[in-house]
Amino acid sequence: MNDDTRAEIILDLCAVLGINAEQTEADDYKLLIAKLNTAIRAIKSARNYPASYNDKKIADDLDNYYANIFDLTIYEYNQTGAEGEISHNENGTNRTYKSRTECFVGVIPFARRVM
């Protein structure tokens, strides 16, 4: 992901999650960045880039998956402390989490030719 796009997604994520983007030493900001990095790595892995792709081509391509990276980061951030749960019920509050794989809809891996 290119630096400008990364800065944009961080601001958007902070706005949605109510995190102060200027307090980069705050625990919630650090957690968000860790979840963003995890999401970027997951999309990279799902894309299965060929060896011919250099870092610039990968970064440019990842910009096309802004929405997937955004959704996956939100998913991972909101699952903090509830990893592995698919639903949660406490004091009359019911939560059902979507599947993590739904965040990968539209992420198409590169195919490899077997010789």
Identify the residue ranges that each predicted region occupies:
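Short loop/turn elements at secondary-structure junctions
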Residues: 2, 57-115
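Conserved short "hinge" loops at termini or chain/domain junctions
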Residues: 1-61, 103-115
